[in-house]
């Protein structure tokens, strides 16, 4: 066997030292609260409805809906509209359910979600999907503070994630949200 090897060696130039790694964002230990919940607006949902009626929602694929199942009554959530900012903090009051079977408490009692006076034209998008992968799902939330999207809180380096529901433990974001919002007791 023959080996052909060639080394290119050069003198180390002054100042050509490897750059140090970028520091990681500070993370607080996660104690089960709060969760960050993305509220993506579109044809089947808008933040004004979620704010008015007390819910977060997702649909259009299993990837979007799956993490809603992490939320349970009593969980604290911070709601963020992607590319806009944080708009609400509240407590989950009812676990995830399909939009076509969900009911929402109103002054007149429990009303089916699809019968609410909603701003969107198609709140029941994909409800004909038999295996739930596309159907719109909602989780009810009692907002301790909920703002219009025009008053969202966003500062450089705040926590954002593409998943619908994630653990919120980014220390700087938690501090900013505790300063900006009224939190439930």
PLM regions with names:
Residues 41, 81, 94-96, 145:
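Short, flexible loop/turn elements at secondary-structure junctions
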Residues 86-97:
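Short beta-strand-centered aromatic/proline hotspots
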Residues 1-37, 41-42, 60-63, 101-185:
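Contiguous surface segments at macromolecular interaction interfaces
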